A protein has these predicted regions:
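Short, well-ordered beta-strand elements within core beta-sheets of diverse protein domains
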Residues: 29-36, 51-57, 143, 251-254, ...
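Rossmann-like NAD(P) dinucleotide-binding subdomain of oxidoreductase/dehydrogenase enzymes
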Residues: 120-261, 393
Length: 488
């Protein structure tokens, strides 16, 4: 059986203990994975600390060259990495192969260029004084990445972190360890020096906790659940943090919207990536005048989505990450019905028409709950699965109030042709990102992140460097400015 070890200081390091990672679509054991803890984290942090001075002082152009080389290697291995990601996560192969893994390659290409444009500023005070700033790496960084789009998210952290001159310890979710192992291997193949990128496998409560608490770690970039993020900030001490946490993103569809395009986008935003995405438009608010027709058409199309083998290019909904997560999502569907929502598509049970080799898989049909009240738990709590909650609203004021009436504030989506309404809502909605008349279309130059319980800090473009860089001010006197004379 395949064994997944740690990558520490350029070496493939065996673990003292191992656990199994399984294919969520079939139940098949894919590999034995090293279960790291404090000892492995100490080794990795020490390696990163030792590698930091030389890496930080490497000419920026040389670091950029190595980043581009790593991006090229990923690009050359997209089919292999995509197949690995699909097997480990249950994500449909058409998404991993055509979108998510190519994005990972682009992350290195993009940040190789952006890091070379990071410059300090000068502040001439007068003819006697000059201030200027230096942009410098922070040192050893903890990168903690989630299971839902593991390879892309990991590279989104690794690329800006390393490009700026930091070194890193990457800890992936124990539910999706395979592609992180491949990333560690490709980094060495690209020529990135030993110790610059270390990959420690293991559980959050052991390896993850030891990593974020480590005294040599200067910055933590975490993507995951809100409860875990709060615990990290509470327990890890005085460090720099970037926290991309949970979401319960609203979609506001007004009666003057392009309904066909709004339907397309609303379905995609909640059901792509199996609904396991932080920016999922899981609360879909529809203006009362168009509510009945929109709900009918939305449910009809949800019922036609193809659920099945993630390796089939025609599959749109694959398997949820684990049996435990399946039970959580299924439980929320039952809860929504108990709370009074109307089930129009899907349901809490596995599809009955799965082929024999998928019977043990964690499959759920895309589920539509209509007539949801915004105070129901299914409308307030992050489900993180293919479950859409449909709610009516009367007018702009009520739509905005309902959209904001939740603890999260990551993404938001607005559908209207009224430009004045767009400008008012974009200012008033409590979210880190607002998408108008579109699904979530990302540009790497834009800031990605949320407000309220959805996190702190931003990733993307130069904003990624906020957690990975220190701004140092230098003040220089030209020689004869006045200095107070004390003790004369």
């Amino acid at each position: 059986m395949k064994k997944i070890n740690h990558w520490i200081n350029g070496k493939n390091v065996a673990g003292a203990d191992y656990f199994h990672t399984t294919n969520p679509a079939t139940g098949e054991v894919l590999a034995e994975v090293a279960s790291g803890g404090e000892a492995e984290i100490n080794q990795a942090a020490a390696a990163a600390k030792e590698a930091f001075p030389k890496w930080a002082n490497l000419p920026m152009k040389e670091r950029a060259r190595l980043m581009r080389r790593l991006g090229d290697l990923i690009d050359q291995n997209v089919p292999e990495i995509a197949a690995m990601e699909t097997a480990d996560t249950g994500l449909p192969i058409h998404q991993t192969k055509n979108v998510l893994i190519p994005r990972a390659s682009h992350n290195f290409e993009f940040f190789a260029e952006v890091c070379q444009q990071m410059n300090g500023k000068t502040y001439p005070v007068d003819d006697k004084m000059l201030n200027y700033t230096l942009v410098q790496p922070v040192g050893v960084c903890a990168l903690v990445s989630p299971w839902n789009v593991p390879f892309m998210t990991a590279t989104w952290k690794v690329a800006p972190c390393l490009a700026l001159g930091n070194t890193a310890v990457l800890k992936m979710s124990e539910l999706s360890p395979l592609t992180a192992d491949r990333l560690g291997e490709l980094a060495l193949e690209a020529g990135i020096p030993a110790g610059v990128l270390n990959v420690v496998q293991g559980y959050g409560a052991t390896a993850g906790d030891a990593l974020v608490r480590h005294h040599d770690v200067r910055a933590v970039s975490f993507t995951g659940g809100t409860a875990t993020g709060r615990n990290i900030m509470k327990n890890a001490g005085l460090k720099k943090y970037s926290m991309e946490l949970g979401g319960k993103s609203p979609v506001l569809i007004f009666e003057d919207a392009d309904i066909e395009r709004a339907l397309d986008a609303a379905l995609f935003t909640i059901f792509s990536i199996n609904g396991e995405r932080c920016t999922a438009g899981s609360r879909i608010f529809i203006q009362q005048s168009i509510y009945p027709e929109f709900v009918k058409r939305f449910a009809e199309r949800a019922n036609r989505l193809r659920v099945g083998d993630p390796t089939d290019p025609n599959t749109q909904i694959g398997a949820l990450i684990s049996q435990q997560h399946w039970e959580k999502v299924s439980g929320y569907i039952r809860l929504g019905i108990e709370e009074g929502a109307t089930l129009l598509a899907g349901g809490a049970d596995k599809p009955s028409d799965l082929p024999a080799h998928l019977k043990a898989g964690n499959f759920l049909r895309p589920t539509v709950l209509a007539d949801v009240d915004n105070r129901m738990r299914v409308a307030q709590e992050e489900i993180f699965g293919p479950v859409a909650c449909l709610l009516p609203f009367k007018d702009e004021a009520e739509g905005l109030r309902l959209a904001n009436d939740v603890e999260y504030g990551l993404a938001s989506y607005i559908w209207t042709q009224d430009v004045s309404k767009v400008l008012r809502l974009a200012r008033g909605i409590e979210a880190g990102m607002v998408f108008v008349n579109t699904q979530n279309v990302r540009d790497l130059r834009q800031p990605f992140g949320g407000v309220k319980a959805s996190g702190t800090g931003r990733e993307g473009g130069e904003y990624s460097f906020e957690v990975f860089a220190e701004m140092k001010n230098v003040c220089i006197s030209m020689g004869d400015h006045p200095i107070p004379k004390w003790g004369v």
